[in-house]
Amino acid sequence: MIDFINEDKGSGKPARYVRLSDQSPMDRVKDLLKDHWHFFKPTKPQLAILIIGGGTSFHMEGKYRELFKSGLNIAARSTKAMIVTTGQNMGAVKLVGDAVSEAQYLVPDGPSHLRRALKLLGIANWGLTKNIEDLINIKPNVLNRSHYYSNMEKRTGDVFPINGDHTNFLFVDDGHRNKWEQSYNNFVSRFISMLRDKDPHVMKCLFYNICDSTNLKCFREWIYLWSLFYLKED
């Protein structure tokens, strides 16, 4: 578990996480989501929204920022969507976290617990994550409880802090440090394929690649129309 501290704002709820190899079988990842993290309870999400890109050079203000957030919130709440990002606390991913935080609500989880209804999953590159030493479990047989400062900003040439509005993280370790490798992208591609397969426990998948703020100007209309299409198809 990750307890995010020193936040300007945030859910105040810890995030579950696991560190795994870039070669991990997708059936194991699916079991983790379904059986351990209960991503499909109380009902299976109708849609998975994958928002990738816009990490380092993204900036948006004013009405376009609000259009993006409202479009994402409409899709997330109407379809109980699972949202997937790269988990960074910057750029478009931070904006996604802000949007989900505003739309987030609690649902019962057993007789005496509540949990967050909207699932925001970060698939983060372990070798490019800031302060990974705080996330290493030194007692393998004991549930790790890490404290993470999510207000950190990325400096030039630095690694990436993670966003505290995410509910879960998959940290993909390909053995490399401080650089992007194709192995991470391959893991994300396999994850997308897993979501798109015909298994009844896997929802429909909607992929959006953000290159700059121009792409996001049409996001609200785009996500809304696609949500209607998927719902009608059911």
Residue ranges and their predicted role:
Residues M1-E233:
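Acidic/glycine-enriched connector segments
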